[in-house]
């Protein structure tokens, strides 16, 4: 029987819908303390976090992950109960199987086997686990990192167990992520009767040319590591629902996923210049969710690439595509960060599942990476 499978099931059974942990971290602590980890539970507001470390010297390698999962939606739409882990052939069904309780299980088993083989490993080993990744992400990893910085504790290498793989485990490593800058734009007009437009001002009509220009703008051309910056409108709301009323306001929500070619300050400046050019009366509220980051070829990326090749014979792809992750909070401290985890085809979906054999392969990759990075010779 696979320990990784057993551990994944233990975690899935705990219905830790964000920001709840439901005993996952207490169970993880039991496993890590046996291995000699000093475990600290860190509460920020009502969010539980875990920092566990084995050793006092550098370099420090940390596995990072989250015990919280997204809501299930309509449970009657699921093939099996989402919090009753169920095997079907080589597949394991359950909320969090792929994102990311399977990764955490693989991390623990890999660490058990690595420490058994290398009790006097180089440096220090660590885990950074949060229950606030799938939600607002304000009392999780970002606060743990701030806490560590305040006491001059630095992570040199960090592997985030997000489901990075596409078709088979290890085929893609995320060695960076685009930045995310969102905004809520409220354009003001004058409400009135549609039959008397001269007595009103339609904010939807006013903002339409500006939105067209924003959508057509080439913000940058990207670079060798990042695609071009993307601007997307996600919501437009205006009107009372009546057919004969010109609305008084229009609200637009949009988002940039931006490369290292730009800063969030440059994007804000360019957007506001376009809005001003079109003579709009507006309010604009910005939300910066994360800066872009990139971990270039170096000790961690090379160890991950080598481990994947050793275990699977795959030549992995380095990618910065996709959404944000908690890596965005860790990388700015100077930490080398990669994301490596299961395939992501069913994450956040009804009937989320992962391949049992891939979880075992992932465990081997994690263990091999530790050997590359934290042993001599």
UniProtKB/Swiss-Prot annotation:
GO MF terms held by the record: acetylornithine deacetylase activity; cobalt ion binding; succinyl-diaminopimelate desuccinylase activity; zinc ion binding
InterPro entries assigned: ArgE/DapE_CS (IPR001261), Bact_exopeptidase_dim_dom (IPR036264), DapE_proteobac (IPR005941), Peptidase_M20 (IPR002933), Peptidase_M20_dimer (IPR011650), Peptidase_M20A (IPR050072)
Cell wall biogenesis/degradation recorded as keyword: no
Enzyme Commission identifier(s): 3.5.1.18
Reactions mediated catalytically: N-succinyl-(2S,6S)-2,6-diaminopimelate + H2O = (2S,6S)-2,6-diaminopimelate + succinate
Entry keywords, A to Z: Amino-acid biosynthesis, Cobalt, Diaminopimelate biosynthesis, Hydrolase, Lysine biosynthesis, Metal-binding, Zinc
Cofactor(s) needed: Zn(2+); Co(2+)
Record bears the keyword Metal-binding: yes
GO terms classed as biological process: diaminopimelate biosynthetic process; L-arginine biosynthetic process; lysine biosynthetic process via diaminopimelate
Binding-site residues for Zn(2+) 1, renumbered to this chain: 66, 99, 162
Pathway membership: Amino-acid biosynthesis; L-lysine biosynthesis via DAP pathway; LL-2,6-diaminopimelate from (S)-tetrahydrodipicolinate (succinylase route): step 3/3
Positions annotated to bind Zn(2+) 2: 99, 134, 348
Transmembrane portions of the chain: none
Organism domain of life: Bacteria
Function: Catalyzes the hydrolysis of N-succinyl-L,L-diaminopimelic acid (SDAP), forming succinate and LL-2,6-diaminopimelate (DAP), an intermediate involved in the bacterial biosynthesis of lysine and meso-diaminopimelic acid, an essential component of bacterial cell walls.
Name listed for the protein in its UniProt record: Succinyl-diaminopimelate desuccinylase
Gene of this entry: dapE
């Amino acid at each position: 029987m696979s320990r990784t499978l057993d551990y994944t099931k233990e975690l899935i059974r705990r219905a830790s819908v964000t920001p709840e942990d439901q005993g996952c971290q207490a169970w993880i602590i039991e496993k890590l303390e046996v291995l000699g980890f000093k475990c600290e539970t860190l509460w920020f507001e009502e969010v539980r976090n875990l920092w566990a470390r084995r050793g006092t010297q550098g370099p420090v390698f940390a596995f990072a992950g989250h015990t919280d999962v997204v809501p299930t939606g309509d449970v009657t739409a699921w093939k099996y109960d989402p919090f009753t882990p169920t095997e079907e052939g080589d597949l394991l069904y359950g909320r969090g199987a792929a994102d990311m309780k399977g990764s955490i299980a693989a991390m623990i088993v890999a660490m058990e086997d690595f420490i058994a083989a290398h009790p006097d490993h180089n440096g220090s080993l660590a885990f950074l686990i949060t229950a606030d990744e799938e939600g607002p992400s304000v009392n999780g990893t970002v606060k743990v990192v701030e806490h560590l910085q305040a006491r001059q504790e630095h992570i040199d290498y960090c592997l985030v167990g997000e489901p990075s793989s596409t078709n088979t485990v290890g085929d893609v490593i995320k060695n960076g992520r685009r930045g995310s800058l969102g905004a809520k734009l409220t354009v003001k007009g004058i409400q009135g009767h549609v039959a008397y437009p001269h007595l009103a001002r339609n904010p939807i009509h006013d903002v339409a040319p500006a939105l067209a220009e924003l959508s057509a703008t080439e913000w940058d051309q990207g670079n060798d590591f990042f695609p071009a910056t993307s601007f997307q409108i996600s919501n437009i709301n205006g009107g009372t629902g009546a057919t004969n009323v010109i609305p008084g306001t229009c609200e637009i929500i949009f988002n940039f996923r931006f490369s290292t070619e730009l800063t969030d300050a440059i994007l804000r400046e360019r957007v506001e210049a376009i809005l001003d050019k079109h003579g709009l009366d507006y309010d604009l509220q910005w939300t910066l969710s994360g800066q872009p980051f990139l971990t270039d070829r170096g000790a961690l990326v090379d160890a991950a690439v080598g481990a994947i090749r050793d275990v699977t014979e795959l030549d992995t792809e380095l990618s910065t595509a996709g959404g944000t992750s908690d890596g965005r909070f860790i990388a700015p401290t100077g930490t080398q960060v990669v994301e490596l985890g299961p395939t992501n085809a069913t994450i956040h979906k009804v009937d989320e599942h992962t391949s049992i054999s891939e979880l075992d392969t992932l465990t081997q990759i994690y263990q091999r990476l530790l050997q590359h990075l934290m042993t001599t010779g």
